[in-house]
Amino acid sequence: MVRYKATISYDGTLFSGFQRQPNARSIQEEIEKTLLRLNSGIPVTVHGAGRTDAGVHAYGQVIHFDLPQERDPEKLRFGLDTQCPDDIDIVSIELVSEEFHARYSKHIKTYEFLVDAGRPKNPMMRNYAIHYPYPLSLALMQEAAMELVGTHDFTGFTASGTSVENKVRTITQASVSIDEKTGFYVFAFSGNGFLYKQVRNMVGTLLKIGNGRMPVSQAKTVLESRDRNLAGPTVAGNGLYLKEIRYE
């Protein structure tokens, strides 16, 4: 078998998430259906680096799959791209060794989250950013975001009931900025892995800090206490983007 690594992007609005699930549309299933046609009716399993949730978008999701023969990567990319639905784009495909695994090979993920704090809101962006119509202090959110950088137990920022036992992760970069073109707040996080809804819970906490309803020290308090109840709300997934995945 020959292994292929692909970088893909997608608009997550009409998907139930990346992972295949019964009676729901998923990115994994759509790509597998297309590969089935390209592989003479023989099923192909797609493995993704990140299992994004419903409504979450991606610029740089990475997948891998195996085919029984070697094909020209660009011709394969073109065939897969043109036969996939319009809300999925196959950015690139390359040949990799059988040791490569999109999910388990060591990598750094970068997520971005967009917040429209304008009044009135921009209805054209309702599927691509959350609306937060309250005053925000960029400086307070930037200061609090720095507390998240480093190796920590992120139990307080993950969804309750998760089956993952080891909740220690390393965040190498956390920032908050304003996009000069749109005026949207851009929350960016890079790390070696993220827990279920971790990014959305961190953004929810930073927004409360930026609005003055939580102290700047709250991010550190949540980390130290490991208490989800002390963090902010889980923001909606439509503002979240899997921006990039870099492998070692």
UniProtKB/Swiss-Prot annotation:
<comment type="function">
    <text>Formation of pseudouridine at positions 38, 39 and 40 in the anticodon stem and loop of transfer RNAs.</text>
</comment>
<comment type="similarity">
    <text>Belongs to the tRNA pseudouridine synthase TruA family.</text>
</comment>
<feature type="active site" description="Nucleophile">
    <location>
        <position position="53"/>
    </location>
</feature>
<dbReference type="InterPro" id="IPR020097">
    <property type="entry name" value="PsdUridine_synth_TruA_a/b_dom"/>
</dbReference>
<keyword id="KW-0413">Isomerase</keyword>
<dbReference type="Pfam" id="PF01416">
    <property type="entry name" value="PseudoU_synth_1"/>
</dbReference>
<dbReference type="GO" id="GO:0160147">
    <property type="term" value="F:tRNA pseudouridine(38-40) synthase activity"/>
</dbReference>
<keyword id="KW-0819">tRNA processing</keyword>
<dbReference type="InterPro" id="IPR001406">
    <property type="entry name" value="PsdUridine_synth_TruA"/>
</dbReference>
<dbReference type="InterPro" id="IPR020103">
    <property type="entry name" value="PsdUridine_synth_cat_dom_sf"/>
</dbReference>
<dbReference type="GO" id="GO:0031119">
    <property type="term" value="P:tRNA pseudouridine synthesis"/>
</dbReference>
<comment type="subunit">
    <text>Homodimer.</text>
</comment>
<dbReference type="GO" id="GO:0003723">
    <property type="term" value="F:RNA binding"/>
</dbReference>
<protein>
    <recommendedName>
        <fullName>tRNA pseudouridine synthase A</fullName>
        <ecNumber>5.4.99.12</ecNumber>
    </recommendedName>
</protein>
<dbReference type="InterPro" id="IPR020095">
    <property type="entry name" value="PsdUridine_synth_TruA_C"/>
</dbReference>
<feature type="binding site">
    <location>
        <position position="111"/>
    </location>
    <ligand>
        <name>substrate</name>
    </ligand>
</feature>
<dbReference type="InterPro" id="IPR020094">
    <property type="entry name" value="TruA/RsuA/RluB/E/F_N"/>
</dbReference>
